[in-house]
Regions:
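N-terminal beta-alpha lobe that positions the nucleotide/phosphoryl donor
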Residues: 1-197, 201-220
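Peripheral (often C-terminal) accessory segments that flank ATP-dependent C-N-forming ligase machineries
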Residues: 65-67, 234-265
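Acidic/polar loop patches that form or flank catalytic/metal-binding clefts of enzymes
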Residues: 49-53, 193-195, 233, 242-249
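Generic alpha-helical structural context detector
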Residues: 12, 149, 224, 233-237
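ATP-dependent carboxylate-activation loops
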Residues: 217-230
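Hydrophobic residues in alpha-helical segments
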Residues: 126, 226, 238-239
Length: 265
C-alpha cells in the first residue's frame, strides 16, 4: 500500500473510477514524488533546501559529465541521490573526487533498476546532522497545521530504526520555525490530507528540506500519542470534505517507536 499510495497514476485511476481518494491530489503526489521537482518547488516557496544541483540529463554519458561538473561546484563530501528514489536506493556518499565516476555510474544503474528512472542529483553531505520530520495535516477548507516533530536520526542502511516524539534536542522556537516551513511546503503544492515533511537539522541549527512523504506513515502513532490527535480519523474527515477537528498543538508526554529488521547474517 505504501508504494501505491505515492503513485500519482494510481490516485488518478481511483478518482476516475468515481471513488474517494484519501490523500493529496495526483498533482501534489507527482510534484513531491520527483525529488528534483520537489527541491525546485521548495526553493520557489522560500523553504530552505540542502545546497546542491539538479541534473536533468537522461543520456548516460551526458548525465555523468553534467554530474561531474556539478560536483566541483557543490563540493565534497557530497551525496548522489536518485530523483525518483526512496529507501536508500540510488544513493551514494562520495568523500573523494577520485571515487565520483564509479559512484555516479553505480547510483544511476541502481536507480534505473529500482525506479525505471536514472536521473541523479547532488546534495552537499551535511555530516553530524539530525533527521527531523514534521507531521502535517491539511483540509479542503484551507486550513493547514503541523503536529510537531519526530526525530529519526538513528538509521540502518538509510532505513529508520527509532522514531521519537518530541525530539530530545528540539526547542519551542525551532519547532515553530520548522513547523511553519513544513506548512509552507504543503501549501506550495496545494496539499490535502496527512503528510510528512522531512528536514535535516545541521549542527549549526540551520535546517533544510529533504523530502515530503505524501501519505500517512507507519510511525504516525508516535505523534498521535503525544498530541492526542487521531491522524487516521482526521484523514478520513478531510477526504469527506469536513474540516479538521483538532485544535492548537499541545504536546504531552514522550513516545518512541522501534522497528525490528530481519537481515541475512
Amino acid at each position: 500500500f505504501g508504494f501505491l499510495s505515492e503513485r500519482a497514476d494510481f490516485a488518478t485511476v481511483v478518482l476516475e473510477a468515481g471513488l474517494t481518494w484519501v490523500g493529496p491530489s495526483p498533482q501534489a503526489i507527482e510534484k513531491m514524488g520527483d525529488k528534483m521537482t520537489a527541491r525546485q518547488t521548495m526553493r520557489q516557496a522560500g523553504v530552505p533546501v540542502i545546497p546542491g544541483e539538479e541534473v536533468e540529463e537522461e543520456d548516460e554519458a551526458a548525465a555523468l559529465e553534467a554530474l561531474r561538473q556539478a560536483s566541483t561546484r557543490v563540493g565534497y563530501p557530497l551525496l548522489l541521490k536518485a530523483s525518483s528514489g526512496g529507501g536508500g536506493k540510488g544513493m551514494r556518499a562520495v568523500h573523494d573526487p577520485a571515487d565520483f565516476d564509479q559512484a555516479a555510474a553505480g547510483a544511476r544503474r541502481e536507480a534505473v533498476a529500482a525506479f525505471g528512472d536514472g536521473r541523479i542529483y547532488i546534495e552537499r553531505l551535511l555530516s553530524g546532522s539530525k533527521h527531523i520530520e514534521i507531521q502535517v495535516l491539511a483540509d479542503q477548507k484551507g486550513r493547514t497545521v503541523h503536529l510537531g516533530e519526530r526525530e529519526c536520526s538513528v538509521q540502518r542502511r538509510h532505513q529508520k530504526v527509532f522514531e521519537e516524539a518530541p525530539g530530545p534536542t528540539m526547542t519551542p522556537e525551532l519547532r515553530n520555525a520548522m513547523g511553519q516551513a513544513a506548512i509552507a511546503a504543503a501549501k506550495a503544492v496545494d496539499y490535502v490530507g496527512a503528510g510528512t515533511v522531512e528536514f535535516l537539522l545541521a549542527p549549526s541549527g540551520e535546517f533544510f528540506f529533504l523530502e515530503m512523504n505524501t501519505r500517512i506513515q507507519v510511525e504516525h502513532p508516535v505523534t498521535e500519542l503525544v498530541t492526542g490527535v487521531d491522524i487516521v480519523r482526521e484523514q478520513l474527515r478531510i477526504a469527506q470534505g469536513e474540516p479538521m477537528s483538532c485544535g492548537d498543538l499541545m504536546l504531552r508526554g514522550h513516545a518512541i517507536e522501534v522497528r525490528l529488521y530481519a537481515e541475512d547474517a
